[in-house]
Swiss-Prot record:
Protein name per UniProt: Guanine nucleotide exchange factor for Rab-3A
Biased composition (Low complexity): 45-58
Listed CDD domains: Rab11BD_RAB3IL1
GO biological process: protein transport
Membrane listed as a keyword: no
Similarity comment text for this entry: Belongs to the SEC2 family.
Natural source organism: Homo sapiens
One CC-aspect GO term: cytosol
Phosphoserine: residues bearing it: S168, S179
InterPro entries according to UniProt: RAB3IL/RAB3IP/Sec2, Sec2_N
Keywords attached to this entry: Coiled coil, Guanine-nucleotide releasing factor, Phosphoprotein, Protein transport, Transport
Region (Disordered): 1-60, 166-198
Segments of skewed composition (Pro residues): 1-17
Gene: RAB3IL1
Bias-annotated ranges (Basic residues): 184-194
Length: 382
């Protein structure tokens, strides 16, 4: 609805009333003129119609602009809300991803720690099992060694009890000590030597050496007895102590000093280590061992002396599979030294329960056997 004349700044044309219109006849055939009132009404209607058209157009434009602005504002608000909601969701997702990442890192760390702990525990268990196995094997080996040693000592003790006789034995109770001319033939079965292998401390009975007259005088050597008592206070197998050093120099060394020096050194070391074995000769084929150009596999040649003798025994050093045939004389010398070492080992281990003087005389008897064997005296074998 039009409310008044338009303002000059709106660019609308001036009203028709302000424009002078000349009087002119529009129809030459018309013989009269219109009245001024009718003309004024017609001009006013046209003017009103001309003014309402641009105002309506401007109003429509304004309305369109207002609607467009409203649509833009609503679209902008909607987009802002969508952006805000998307940012919020993205933030939540980022937080969730960060939380899940922390959980994953924690799980990975726990898994790594658990794996390391399992490996460490497994390694510890394996190490403990290996240590227990090694300890068990060591104990088993020691137990077997002790069993072997005890068996050898029992055998040696039996032999020592059998072969040890008093200085003046009762020949009526022991007819085997009589000479063959006085003893006469004996009925029944006689003892024969065992054919099984025997360790060196348990071989060669020494009864043939210990025959002494009924009235044998004895006197203790004070120097030897003092050295023995000093050794007895702290028994040892160290050859540097005065007591054993004298025995080595006077008895053991000369008794084991054979022609074949190389083999003599090995035999002496085996006797000291208690690893020498003496066995009776068997009929099976044996490996040949050469020592200083002497055929040690022959039963007619002694590997230690190099002399041609009937060899009824052979020796083996330690765990070696090689054997050396020895003559009766060489065997007697070796067994005499073995008997001495066996007895001093018993003293060292506390197995001999005697006073100092009886122990001293037993050692002197064993030294006497070594001296006799070195000089070539040995019992004849049946």
């Amino acid at each position: 609805m039009w409310s008044g004349p338009p303002q000059p700044d709106q660019g609308l044309p001036p009203p028709l009333a302000a424009v002078p219109v000349p009087w002119k006849s529009t129809d030459p055939c018309q013989g009269h003129r219109e009245s001024p009132g009718a003309l004024v009404e017609t001009s006013a209607g046209e003017e009103a119609q001309g003014q309402e058209g641009p105002a309506a157009a401007q109003l429509d434009v304004l309305r369109l602009r207002s609607s467009s602005m409203e649509i833009r504002e609503k679209g902008s608000e909607f987009l802002k809300e969508e952006l805000h909601r998307a940012q919020k969701e993205l933030k939540l997702k980022d937080e969730e991803c960060e939380r899940l990442s922390k959980v994953r890192e924690q799980l990975e760390q726990e898994l790594e720690e658990l794996t390391a702990s399992l490996f460490e525990e497994a390694h510890k268990m394996v190490r403990e099992a290996n240590m227990k196995q090694a300890a068990s094997e060591k104990q088993l080996k020691e137990a077997r060694g002790k069993i072997d040693m005890l068996q050898a000592e029992v055998t040696a003790l039996k032999t020592l009890v059998i072969t040890s006789t008093p200085a003046s034995p009762n020949r009526e109770l022991h007819p085997q000590l009589l000479s063959p001319t006085k003893a006469g033939p004996r009925k029944g079965h006689s003892r024969h030597k065992s054919t099984s292998s025997t360790l060196c401390p348990a071989v060669c009975p020494a009864a043939g050496h210990t025959l002494t007259p009924d009235r044998e005088g004895k006197e203790v050597d004070t120097i030897l007895f003092a050295e023995f008592q000093a050794w007895r206070e702290s028994p040892t197998l160290d050859k540097t102590c005065p007591f054993l050093e004298r025995v080595y120099r006077e008895d053991v060394g000369p008794c084991l000093d054979f022609t074949m020096q190389e083999l003599s050194v090995l035999v002496r070391a085996a006797v000291e280590d208690n690893t020498l074995t003496i066995e009776p000769v068997a009929s099976q084929t044996l490996p040949t061992v050469k020592v200083a150009e002497v055929d040690c596999s022959s039963t007619n040649t002694c590997a230690l002396s190099g002399l041609t003798r009937t060899c009824r025994h052979r020796i083996r050093l330690g765990d070696s599979k090689s054997h050396y045939y020895i003559s009766p004389s060489s065997r007697a010398r070796i067994t005499a030294v073995c008997n001495f070492f066996t007895y001093i080992r018993y003293i060292q281990q506390g197995l001999v329960r005697q006073d100092a003087e009886p122990m001293f005389w037993e050692i002197m008897r064993l030294r006497k056997e070594m001296s006799l064997a070195k000089l070539g005296f040995f019992p004849q074998e049946a």
